[in-house]
Each structure stands twice: as C-alpha cells, then as structure tokens.
Amino acid sequence: MLHTTPSGLLIIDKPQGVTSFDAVAAVRGALHIKKVGHAGTLDPMATGTLVIAFGHATRLLNAIVAHDKTYEATIRLGLRTTTDDAEGEVLVDGEARSRWQTLSAQLTEGGQSGEPTALPTASWQDLLTRTIATNFTGDIEQVPNTFSAIKINGQRAYDLAREGKDVELKPRPVTISEFTVLDIRSGFVAGEQAAEPLREDANTGAIPALDVDVRISCSSGTYIRALARDLGKELGVGGYLTRLRRTRVGRFALPDDASGLIAPEAMLDTRTHTVTAHTDQKTFTNREGQTVTRNKCVLDTPEGLAGDERRNWLLDHALTMEQAARGAMPALDITPEEASELRFGRRIERTISEPTAAIVPQTHDVAAIIERANAHQAKPVTVFPLA
C-alpha cells in the first residue's frame, strides 16, 4: 500500500545492548520510511533518550544535537578499565591501591595500610562533593575518551585504539551545570570483570571499590565516561563508568527525568510520546556464508499489532512536525502570507536574533527555519514543503 511520507519525532527509550543505529533501523522498518536519523549517539551499554526524526523532521536534528543533556550514571571508583567503562578490560593500578589505603587511613579511624578497606559512604560523600565542586562543575576542559568516535586524520579514535596505536585527543571546552551524587555503595570486587557487582565480603585478593550514582547535566559533546575517568584520576584511585542512562536531550525528556531543568510551560508530553524498546537477537548468513547472531532493537507496541496498524500506532505516539520544531528551537508564529514568501526564498519583516522555526499556528504549518538577515528582517535557511 502507498503511504504519504509523514514527518515527526519519536522519543525512544533505548535498551542496553544495541546501537543507536539499531534503533534507527527499527523505526525505519516499522514506519516504512527511508529518511530516518537520530540526535546524538548512545553507546550500546547506555540506555535512555534517543530522539529519532523521520521525514522532513530530520532537518531539525542539527539543532537538537546541540542541546544540553542530562544523564544518570554509576561511577565505580577504585579501578580503571581500558575503555573507561564496563566494556573494557580491568586495569589494576598499584599506585591507585596505595592511594586507596591512604584515603582509608584519612577517612576512617584506624585505617591500616595493606588491608582492603571499604570506606564509610558518609566520609566519601563529603570528599566527593568537594572534589566535584572544585574540579567538575561549570566550564571545564575535557579530554575525550580514547575509545570514542572522534576522527583523527580520517580515522575513528576507537579504531586506532583497537589497533594498538597511540591516540592523542586535544582537550575541548564543556559545561557541567549539574553533577549531583545521588547514592554511594561500598564493597569489594575481584577485579576480573569490569561489570561484576559489588559484594560485601572481602575475600583473599579482594579489591575495595565504591559505586557512586550520579546525575549530570551538561553541554553537548560532554563524555560521561571521561568524567568518570577524570574523577577517579583526581582522587588518585581510578574510576570508570558501569551504568549510563540519558534522561533528557533539551526539552525532549523521558518520564523519569529528575533534572528539573525544563520549565513547566516548556514541557512536552513525554509520557504520550515515549516509545520503549527491548533487545532481541537475529541470526543471518553473511556474505562469507557464515551464520552470525547479533542483537537487534525491537520497538514495544501493543501485542497483535502488525503492518499498517503498528505503523499507525507509532505515528500516533510521535511528536508532530510542529511539536518537533517548537521543541528543537525558538519558534515564531507567522501568517500564511509570510509562509508563502519564505517558501519563495524571500525575506520577511521580522526581528530575530537566532535560528528560529517559522510556524503558521492556525494550520500547524512549519514553513521554514529562519535566521537574522538584518536588524529588521529574517531570511529562510531551510524551507519545508507545505504538508
């Protein structure tokens, strides 16, 4: 059956174990639309807000990518990994162990060097609060992770790192508007697997560690793995990320977002427009004739829906083009006559200071993205066809 191509946004709650591209592929297949993209990659181990645009709304993605974001994460202190997260190999650092014992003696009564000690969480709370406030809030310089998608002379940093090559990334400015410690758990790990849970007993060879739950609101381009790495480095004990959940991208937030950074009048109805998903497996034969099994992203829709019914259910849960544009950038209500002028590439007599969505409110028509031409006029930089 032929369909008119719709445009809008889906807020996907990405599950763990799949890539952001897997989620895009799931939306593309369910909606039968080729033009689909996302506003900011989430690593496979991460969950949460993935803003996926389809149709003409993909032209809003550049604006959405630049929005600030909120994450909830768990940082493990006491060890390091090769990738600064739970996907890498554990690195047991003798200097870090020694530093842990020094902190143990400072923060506990009778802490003895040479013995694995789980520090009281109350003592850690004060130390972490002071360290974060001094070093990891406001405008800071951050060196991205070696295992990142940043390109160096045309090659991804993670590809170079996997090949064993030296990767040098320059620090870049980022802004941390919130870095709150939510909970602290003290315990021990064997140090063999990065994702192993903390345990209370200290067996022979056990390594003391601390899991710190945090909420971080930050500018676009901030690496939470790098914050975990740098917090551990600042304390001298090592650190890496074991859990990451993105709860907000600009005004697009999951129902469980607790940042409080979206003004009530600016809130979108995310409960209606969030689609959860889960990880499943698919098996296929590759070009070499090998049988391959890998994870895939499956969108959660009511049981029994398929084909057009499933497609329509997802479209009903999507943000419309107008809602998407108003959420992506400042919006300006215009007249139908002004919309026509913009579609012909002409300027309109409006004063604006930043890229703005020009919308005819009566018909919900998103005509264009406009920018300042001069003190009294605005000009179109992106024009959308009349729906």
Swiss-Prot record:
- List UniProt keywords, sorted A-Z: Isomerase, tRNA processing
Q: Which domain of life is it from?
A: Bacteria
Which cysteines share a disulfide bond?
none
What is the catalytic activity of this protein? uridine(55) in tRNA = pseudouridine(55) in tRNA
Alphabetized GO MF terms: RNA binding; tRNA pseudouridine(55) synthase activity
The active site lies at 43 (nucleophile)
Enzyme class label: isomerase
Keyword Isomerase present in the record's keywords: the answer is yes
GO terms in the biological process aspect are:
mRNA pseudouridine synthesis; tRNA pseudouridine synthesis
Which EC number applies? 5.4.99.25
Q: Which family does it belong to?
A: Belongs to the pseudouridine synthase TruB family. Type 1 subfamily.
Q: What does this protein do?
A: Responsible for synthesis of pseudouridine from uracil-55 in the psi GC loop of transfer RNAs.
Instruction: Tell me what this protein is called.
Output: tRNA pseudouridine synthase B
Q: Which organism is it from?
A: Bifidobacterium longum (strain NCC 2705)
Organism classification: Bacteria, Bacillati, Actinomycetota, Actinomycetes, Bifidobacteriales
